[in-house]
Structures are given as structure tokens and as C-alpha cells.
Amino acid sequence: MSQNRPAAFNTLRMGEVIREKVQDGITGETRDLQYTQCKIVGNGSFGVVFQTKLSPSNEDAAIKRVLQDKRFKNRELQIMRIVRHPNIVQLKAFYYSNGERRDEVYLNLVQEFVPETVYRASRFFNKMKTTMPILEVKLYIYQLFRALAYIHSQGICHRDIKPQNLLLDPTTGILKLCDFGSAKILVENEPNVSYICSRYYRAPELIFGATNYTTKIDVWSTGCVMAELMLGQPLFPGESGIDQLVEIIKVLGTPTREQIRTMNPNYMEHKFPQIKPHPFNRVLRKADNNAIDLIARLLEYTPTERLGAIDAMVHPFFDDLRNPSTKLPDSRHQTGQVRDLPPLFDFNRHELSIAPQLNHQLVPPHVRPTLAAQGLDIDHFTPMRKEDMLARLD
């Protein structure tokens, strides 16, 4: 275990190198890691995130440092070691270090560094008195759904989807989901806490106190993020838990008794003010029919009525991304330059096994020869068994 105190990061002298014995993020094998030049780039109730440079490669990395309760295994570490996906931030290594107090132990997660977030990108367009270009909304939300389709097929629910947890490389347009600090493998008939997820993005069943919720809470959150990127502000800006429900009702209208039953049957007898829905095309005035249709299918009161992540990926809203001639304009610098879209269809066998009946919609014709050359011919495809796709913790 490292003797470096958490404060050591803040007192690094220029050019000073810290050496750690770390465990590899994939294999768990012990190896040496050296890094230098640390600066704090984020902190919260969980701990601190430092940006650092790995030595001698000079590669940027992020180190997330959290206080570890010795009585429990760290769920975030367990899940980060399981997930491997182009749209999920990669765990490079991890190690433990002592804190200021004798009994304090910190877990340090060494992850790839991604320079931007969707939250900051959205604020950039706000300052320019405009909203994010719709092609970028499509690009980011599609990649988020791709990450969710993958983790949901493993039984993992992220439980804190919000713009701040969506990392972005503005030069490539690649999105990576981060912060699995609230993530959990959901097991049927095992209760889960309802007080998770950041307020503006909380699914109504969570506000109703449900403990038997599903991965569809992440789908609701994604609908909220998508609408926010199109609006330039949160769709449901509640000031408290119950006010959050009021904001949702102002748009979706009062849920029916049946809808309330699907969220939490214990609330059946509550009397809610009767409010008519406010159509999405009036809330999102600039949105086209495909955008409106998708958001309406994501923001359903009844969890089972919401689209699954993989179903959302094949929605016509994302058809532009499947067109091989679509290019990504540089919206930040207004140079008039365009670039290729990042890889969006480099699916592996696991991803193609999630909903094999959708593969012909999922994989555009121009990509099929590339996948076939890797042994993934969607016309002659044997999917993995669902149980083999589920994540299992030690």
C-alpha cells in the first residue's frame, strides 16, 4: 500500500515523479506506475479527481481518489473492472493509499483522461446564445445509448446519468460515460435504494420511492439530457424532490391511477392535482417530429413503456448518423471545416447479441463488410446467451 497522503498530490513540485505499485484494471496484475504534474479537476461528496501525466509515456490520465470503507468491497471498482466499451471511460489501474488519519484508506482509480463534458459543451452554446447543433445532440445521445445498451445487457444500472457524467473529446466527437460511483447490478426481487440519481434527471418511480425499479431509470435520465441539450436548460428543474414531480406533471400531465401503480402501488390513493399534458412540440419548439417522437417514448411514466436503450439506437432520429456521407462540422470555431463522425458501429459480439432481431437496423449496410471480416456476419450470426452476458461480481 502506498504511503502517499492525499495531500501529496497538491504539493508535487514541478517535474517530481510519484511511483506506485498498482494493479492492472483488466488483469489485476501488479505493476509499477509513475506519474507527475497533478492538478485537481473535480471534487464532490465522493472524493477528488486529479489530472495527471503518466511517465514516461506522457499520456494524460485521471486519478479518482475515494475514501474506502474497509468493511465493504468497492462496488465502483468491481463494476469498472467488468465493463469494457468504446463509450465507457476505461480503468487503467487502481491502488490503495493511506490517508491523513491512521485508519483512513483511499482507493485510487487511474482512468483515461477525457478533456470535456457534455455539461460544459452545453454551457458553451448557452454563452453563444444558441443551442447545441442537432447533429451533435444525435451523436452524443446515440453514444450514450450505446454505452447503456451494453451495461444494461449485463444487468448494470448506472443510476446517475447527467450531463456532468458524460465525458467528451471535442476533437473526435467521442462520448464516454463516467462515474460509476452509484452504479449497481440490479437483481430481480432484490430491493434498491430510491434516493439515487441527481434531481433533474430522476425518473418518477424514484421520486415515488420505488425500490423495485429497473435499468429504465437510466433511459428516463437520458431523455432529460436529450431535451436539455435541445432546450439549453433542464427540462424539469425541480427545487426539491416533490417539486421535481410537479415539474414533470406540468409537461406530462397528471399520471393516471394505472401509471401510478406501475411506478409505486403504495401511492395509489394519493390525490394529485389534475393537470393536462403540455405537448412536447410546444415545449421543444424547434424540434422535428423524430426528436419529439423519441423524447415522448423515453419520458413515459410507465417504466415498461419506455424504449430500451438498444431500441432507442435504431430510432429514425439517429438515421443521419447511419448515412455514410454525414460529416461533423466544427461548431466551436466556426471554421467551416468538417470531419468524419467517430466510429459508431464497431459493435462486438456481445453488443450484437443484445437484440439480434434489430441488427439489420443497427448496422448500416456500408459497415457490414467490415464486421463480416471480423467474423461478425449479421446474416449468419449466433448470439451469446442472455445469461452469459450478465455481469457477475466476485
UniProtKB/Swiss-Prot annotation:
Residues 35-318 form the Protein kinase domain. It catalyses: L-seryl-[protein] + ATP = O-phospho-L-seryl-[protein] + ADP + H(+). SMART domains: S_TKc. It is found in: Cytoplasm. Disulfide bonds: none annotated. Its EC number is 2.7.11.1. Signal peptide: none annotated. GO terms for biological process: cell differentiation; positive regulation of developmental process; signal transduction. The keyword Nucleotide-binding applies. GO terms for cellular component: cytoplasm; nucleus. Keywords: ATP-binding, Cytoplasm, Germination, Kinase, Nucleotide-binding, Serine/threonine-protein kinase, Stress response, Transferase, Virulence. ATP binds at residues 41-49, 64. InterPro entries: GSK-3 (IPR050591), Kinase-like_dom_sf (IPR011009), Prot_kinase_dom (IPR000719), Protein_kinase_ATP_BS (IPR017441), Ser/Thr_kinase_AS (IPR008271), STKc_GSK3 (IPR039192). It comes from the Eukaryota. Pfam families: Pkinase. GO terms for molecular function: ATP binding; protein serine/threonine kinase activity; protein serine/threonine/tyrosine kinase activity. Induction: Expression is regulated by MPS1 MAP kinase, particularly under stress conditions. Disruption phenotype: Leads to significant delay in mycelial growth, complete loss of conidiation and inability to penetrate the host surface by mycelia-formed appressorium-like structures, consequently resulting in loss of pathogenicity. Protein kinase that acts downstream of the MPS1 MAPK cascade as a highly conservative signal modulator that dictates growth, conidiation and pathogenicity. Phosphorylates HAT1 at 'Ser-8' to block its translocation from the nucleus to the cytoplasm where HAT1 positively regulates appressorium development and pathogenicity. PANTHER family: GLYCOGEN SYNTHASE KINASE-3 ALPHA, PROTEIN KINASE SHAGGY-RELATED. Belongs to the protein kinase superfamily. CMGC Ser/Thr protein kinase family. GSK-3 subfamily. This is Glycogen synthase kinase 1. The lineage of its organism: Eukaryota, Fungi, Dikarya, Ascomycota, Pezizomycotina. The gene is GSK1.
